[in-house]
Regions:
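Bacterial Sec-dependent N-terminal signal peptides
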Residues: 1-29
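Contiguous, structured surface segment used for ligand recognition
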Residues: 20-161
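Feature activates predominantly on carbohydrate-active enzymes
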Residues: 98-324, 330-342, 383, 387
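Structural recognition of the beta-strand scaffold that forms the well-ordered cores
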Residues: 162-165, 194, 282, 342-344, ...
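Active-site beta-loop-alpha junctions enriched in small/polar residues
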Residues: 169, 198-202, 285-289, 348-350, ...
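Active-site neighborhood of glycoside hydrolase catalytic domains
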Residues: 293-299, 304-409, 416-419, 423
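Conserved alpha/beta catalytic core and glycan-binding cleft of carbohydrate-active enzymes
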Residues: 402-408, 415-446
Length: 446
C-alpha cells in the first residue's frame, strides 16, 4: 500500500561476554515488565543432561523451541518426558483463572516450574526464561555455565493483539528472512504476524488456479528505489544496499526483481510461527492495490481502464461477476494455507474514478440499489465478508472500510492517525480494532 510500513527487520544486538568466572549471571530485565516479579537469593544452573517434563504432548513443539534457544548453552540434547517427577524443568497446562497467554513461573536452585492457561502462555514463559539468561546465549561461542536467578513471576499480556506487519510486496523477503522476523517477534512476545502478500509492486503468494500471478506478477522491472539501492551499494561499497542475486532475473534483456512463496514455503513458515505462539495473518489487498494481478489478468479491471489514476492504481471491477469469482477463488486457497481465525483483505486507498465511467459498475449500482461508487465499494466489502464467514474466517480491513456496514465479526486496522472517527465508529459497531496509527507505528513516519 501507498502508506504501509517500510518493511524493516528489527535488529537485536547480542553481546558476547568473555569472563574468567565459571558462571555467567544475568541482571533481571524482562520485556514487557511482568505483572509481578519477586527475586530471592540463589540461582538455577543450566547443565548438560537436563530433563524437561510436560503435562501434555501438545507442548512438545514448545520444548523444541526451548531447545533451540539453549543450543549455545548446553552441549547435549535434553530429555523430554510427560513424567513430572525427577525433572529439572516442568511445563504444565493448567487453568490458572487468568486471561489467555497468562503464566506463572517459579525457579529455585533445584528446578523451574511453569503453569500456563494455554500454549501461548507456555511460549511467553519460555521467552521469559530466555530473557533471564545473558545475551551471550544468542551467539555461538565457547560453552560457559549459565544460571537463572531464583524468582517467582506471574504475568499476562496487556494486549490481545501484539502485532508486526511485514510488507513483502514492495520488497520481497525470502523464507529465511521471514523466519528471522518471527524469531525477533517471539523474543519480544509479539503474537500476530501481519503478512502483506500482494500489492501493485508484486504478488507474493502462489495461487495454483491463477499461475500468472507468480510466474509474471511476482516480478517487476527495476524501479527507482531498486536502482538507487544498487547504485549506493556500488558507490558506498556497502552490501546492505545490494539486492541479492536470488531476487533478480534477466528476462529478454530486462532486469527483473521479485520472488514469491510456494504453498510449501507458506506451510513451513506457518509451522515455524505456530511453534513460537504466533498467528500468521495474510493480507490480499483489494479492490485497490491490485495492479500486480490486473497486469496479468486485465479482464479483472473495468474494460480499457488499467493503470494509474490521480493517486492510486486502477482497481478491480466489482461490476463483473467473473471478477468476484476470481477474488473468491484466491481466498479459497489462502484460507486453506492459513489455519487461523482472521484474514486481511485490505480495502484501503481505492481509486474509484473508473467505476464512475464503467457501464458494468453503474449497472451493479442500479441493481443493488446503491447510491454512489462509495456504496459500491461498501457492497463489495460486505459481499466478501459473507464469503469469509461462510468459510469460517473473519475479515480484517484497513480503517477505510469502517463505514461499509461490516458485522461485529469483522476487525478494523486503524492506520490513519488523522481519521479520528474510525476508532469510535468501529467500537460502536462492536468491531475489534487493531491500533497502529501511522504517526507512532510506521517506520517511515518515525
Amino acid at each position: 500500500m501507498f502508506k504501509k510500513l517500510s518493511s524493516s527487520l528489527l535488529i537485536v544486538s547480542a553481546c558476547v561476554f568473555s569472563s574468567c568466572t565459571p558462571t555467567v549471571k544475568q541482571e533481571i530485565a524482562i520485556l514487557p515488565t511482568p505483572v509481578s516479579l519477586t527475586e530471592q537469593s540463589g540461582s538455577f544452573v543450566l547443565k548438560d543432561g537436563m530433563k524437561i517434563g510436560v503435562s501434555d504432548q501438545s507442548l512438545f513443539p514448545a520444548i523444541g523451541y526451548l531447545q533451540e534457544i539453549l543450543r549455545n548453552v548446553i552441549s547435549s540434547s535434553v530429555e523430554v518426558t510427560t513424567d513430572k517427577n525427577q525433572v529439572d524443568m516442568y511445563f504444565q497446562l493448567k487453568d490458572t483463572g487468568g486471561k489467555p497467554g497468562s503464566y506463572k513461573l517459579q525457579s529455585t536452585p533445584e528446578y523451574i516450574r511453569v503453569e500456563a492457561n494455554d500454549y501461548s502462555g507456555i511460549i511467553s514463559a519460555i521467552t521469559t526464561i530466555r530473557q533471564l539468561l545473558p545475551a551471550a546465549i544468542e551467539v555461538q561461542g565457547e560453552k560457559q555455565t549459565y544460571s537463572i536467578p531464583v524468582v517467582q513471576i506471574e504475568d499476562a499480556p496487556r494486549f490481545e493483539w501484539r502485532g508486526f506487519m511485514l510488507d513483502a510486496s514492495r520488497h520481497f523477503w525470502n523464507k529465511d528472512e521471514v523466519k528471522h522476523v518471527l524469531d525477533l517477534m517471539s523474543l519480544y512476545k509479539l503474537n500476530k504476524f501481519h503478512w502483506h502478500l500482494s500489492d501493485d509492486q508484486g504478488w507474493r503468494i502462489e495461487i495454483e488456479k491463477y499461475p500468472l500471478l507468480t510466474e509474471k506478477g511476482a516480478w517487476r522491472k527495476f524501479n527507482k528505489h531498486d536502482r538507487t539501492c544498487m547504485a549506493r551499494a556500488k558507490e558506498e561499497d556497502n552490501t546492505d544496499f545490494l539486492i541479492p542475486e536470488d531476487k533478480i532475473r534477466i528476462v529478454e534483456g530486462d532486469t527483473l526483481y521479485g520472488g514469491y512463496y510456494t504453498h510449501d514455503d507458506i506451510k513451513e513458515i506457518v509451522a515455524y510461527a505456530t511453534q513460537r505462539g504466533i498467528d500468521v495473518i495474510p493480507e490480499i489487498d483489494m479492490p485497490g492495490h491490485f495492479l500486480a494481478a490486473i497486469s496479468q489478468y486485465p479482464e479483472l479491471a473495468c474494460d480499457g481502464l488499467i493503470g494509474w489514476g490521480e493517486i492510486f492504481s486502477s482497481p478491480i471491477c466489482p461490476g463483473k461477476d467473473a471478477t468476484l469469482e476470481f477474488c473468491r477463488n484466491v481466498f479459497k486457497e489462502v484460507f486453506e494455507l492459513f489455519p487461523y481465525e482472521y484474514v486481511h483483505m485490505g480495502g484501503d486507498e481505492v481509486e474509484k474514478a473508473n467505476w464512475k465511467k464503467c457501464p458494468l459498475c453503474q449497472k451493479r449500482i442500479r441493481t443493488e440499489k446503491l447510491g454512489s461508487v462509495e456504496e459500491l465499494q461498501a457492497w463489495f466489502v460486505r459481499d466478501m465478508e459473507k464469503f469469509f464467514l461462510a468459510n469460517g474466517k473473519r475479515l480484517i480491513g484497513w480503517d477505510e472500510v469502517v463505514a461499509d456496514g461490516l458485522s461485529s465479526d469483522a476487525a478494523i486496522t486503524w492506520w490513519r492517525s488523522w481519521a479520528k472517527d474510525a476508532l469510535p465508529t468501529a467500537t460502536a459497531q462492536k468491531q475489534k480494532v487493531i491500533a497502529c496509527p501511522n504517526e507512532y507505528f510506521y517506520f517511515d513516519y518515525a
